[in-house]
C-alpha cells in the first residue's frame, strides 16, 4: 500500500538537505580539528539566482567590542552533521589576514572588485560565474 492508497500513512523520515536561513544564522563554524572559528552572523543570497553567495562570520571581540565580520564564499564551508556545525580549513594566519570589516560597519556588496578580492583570497570560484 502506498501513501496515495492510505491517506493516513506517514512518509519515511529521512535527513533532508534543506534548512531555514534563520537556523543557519548563529551556527558555529569550526576547523576540521573541531576548534571554533566563529559563528554565522548572516547569509548573503544572490537575488537573481537564489543561491547563497557568502556566509558572514562574526569573529573575535568581547561583548561585540572589536568584533570583526568575515565574508566567506559559501562554497568554502562544509556542513558536518556529526557535530552540527560548518567547517572551514583555515589557519590562524589566513584568518588574521582574511578580508573583513568591523561589526559596526557594512561591507560594500555593490563593489564587484571587493567580491573578486574575497574569491581570490579564498581561492573560490565567483558565485556570479557558476
Label each region the model flagged:
Residues 1-130:
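Peripheral interaction segments used for macromolecular assembly
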Amino acid at each position: 500500500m502506498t501513501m496515495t492508497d492510505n491517506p493516513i500513512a506517514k512518509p519515511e523520515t529521512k535527513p533532508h538537505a534543506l534548512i531555514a536561513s534563520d537556523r543557519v544564522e548563529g551556527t558555529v563554524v569550526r576547523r576540521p580539528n573541531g576548534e571554533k572559528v566563529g559563528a554565522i552572523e548572516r547569509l548573503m543570497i544572490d537575488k537573481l539566482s537564489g543561491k547563497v553567495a557568502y556566509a558572514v562570520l562574526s569573529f573575535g571581540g568581547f561583548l561585540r567590542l572589536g568584533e570583526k565580520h568575515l565574508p566567506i564564499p559559501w562554497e568554502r564551508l562544509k556542513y558536518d552533521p556529526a557535530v552540527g556545525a560548518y567547517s572551514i580549513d583555515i589557519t590562524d594566519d589566513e584568518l588574521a589576514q582574511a578580508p573583513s570589516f568591523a561589526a559596526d560597519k557594512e561591507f560594500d556588496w555593490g563593489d564587484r572588485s571587493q567580491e573578486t578580492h574575497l574569491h581570490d583570497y579564498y581561492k573560490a570560484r565567483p558565485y556570479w560565474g557558476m
